[in-house]
Curated annotation (Swiss-Prot):
Keywords: Ribonucleoprotein, Ribosomal protein, RNA-binding, rRNA-binding. GO terms for biological process: translation. It comes from Corynebacterium jeikeium (strain K411). The keyword rRNA-binding applies. Belongs to the universal ribosomal protein uL4 family. One of the primary rRNA binding proteins, this protein initially binds near the 5'-end of the 23S rRNA. It is important during the early stages of 50S assembly. It makes multiple contacts with different domains of the 23S rRNA in the assembled 50S subunit and ribosome. Forms part of the polypeptide exit tunnel. The keyword RNA-binding applies. Residues 46-103 are annotated as: Disordered. One of its GO terms (molecular function) is structural constituent of ribosome. InterPro entries: Ribosomal_uL4, Ribosomal_uL4-like, Ribosomal_uL4_dom_sf. Part of the 50S ribosomal subunit. GO terms for cellular component: ribonucleoprotein complex; ribosome. This is Large ribosomal subunit protein uL4. It comes from the Bacteria.
Length: 217
């Protein structure tokens, strides 16, 4: 497999050279089942799991028998906190639990490669030199630049932590979700229509992926 190439876009609407996308990351096998499993685990891990209902033993009251056993013509009852009474306990209701699932690192990495491959194949990954020219943050300029890159609604922007100007420029854009390069994950890639990398963030992501691959050998 040969490496892919993408143009590097500048803030003034031009291009400034190209970048190589390693085939091992951006031209991998895209397994829908694997991506689904990883995304499901990621969403499950975000759940608090603090839901709780009271059983009949937890509800206050209901200590005495509501009426005598015989002679009333009604069905016998032992407590007004039985589940079929209003204000009674809940049967088989949700209790606090941990929803997190164990997902091996190699599965997460493979799913992310599959998600990035899918976005590249559909021309939905863009690389930019900088989001705004100079060192002055500008939400207006960042919005205009992103709209020139894509007309789709949801955009994931991947930046380095040091790119403070870009962070401040896109923070208030409702259609833009921003991540640091080492936080890139399958769910956010698939949830966005397009992915925009800064050159620095792309290089940092590729270098980290290569380092992880070497350590795994």
């Amino acid at each position: 497999m040969s490496n892919l190439k993408l143009d590097v876009h500048t803030a003034d609407g031009k291009t400034n050279g190209t970048v190589e996308l390693p085939a091992s990351i951006f031209d991998a096998e895209a397994s829908v089942a694997l991506m689904h499993q990883v995304v499901t685990a990621q969403l499950a891990a975000k759940r608090q799991g603090t839901h709780a209902t009271k059983t009949r033993g937890m509800v206050s009251g209901g200590g005495r028998k509501p009426f005598r056993q015989k002679g009333t013509g009604r069905a016998r009852q032992g407590s007004i906190r039985a589940p079929h009474f209003t204000g009674g306990g809940t049967v088989h209701g949700p209790q606090p639990r941990d929803y997190s699932q164990r997902t091996p690192k190699k599965m997460k990495a493979a799913a992310l490669r599959g998600a990035l491959t899918d976005r590249v194949r559909h021309d939905r990954i863009h690389v930019v030199e900088e989001l705004v020219p100079g060192q002055t943050p500008s939400t207006k300029a960042a919005r205009a630049f992103i709209e020139r890159l894509t007309d789709r609604k949801s955009v994931l922007v991947v930046l380095t932590r040091e790119d403070v100007t870009a962070w401040k420029s896109v923070n208030n854009l409702p259609q833009v979700h921003t991540l640091v390069n080492d936080q890139l994950n399958t769910y956010d890639v698939l949830n966005a229509d397009d992915v925009v990398f800064s050159v620095e963030a792309l290089n940092a992501f590729i270098n980290a992926a290569d380092k992880t691959k070497e350590e795994a050998k």
